[in-house]
């Protein structure tokens, strides 16, 4: 197993607070591997990589990492952080459709919106010759629904082991989307756990609308 020698670079982070939040989430709380860890030799898909902290954390264990990030300004930092490891960087945003969209990332030190490429999941698989994924991490501001849906679910159930994602539920529309996803798709998996951002189990709270309204972001861990 190749050891990571380069220090993680926070170049292009919006500010110190943003860097601190990402560092705490990925490195200190171990949020994305809290329930299901990445295993030696896994093929990993990192959706919404930002500066690449999760990719950097697991790239010495994975046999291959596909790192997806829509903001072109962040790509050089991701390249620097992952140099020498089996990481393919894809400059795009996961979406229901292929095309372009105006996009702004609040983790970047430039608030000007930019046009970014959008790519659907099946195109992502085809363009990168992906035939299986052991572990998917997703934090892509609603792109989770472009991943887990009726079109993609059959492939996912045959070819993916675990999915870990951050869902946003702070707004009314987000809560409606989440409840539909919760009731239709989550029961189709072998197991799932739901945690608050600070790593407290809230699986059954999320079936109570009163409790749901108290959360803005949640983490879902899925055993496919």
Label each PLM-derived region with a short phrase.
Residues 1-224:
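Phosphate/nucleotide-binding beta-alpha loop and adjacent structural elements of enzyme active sites
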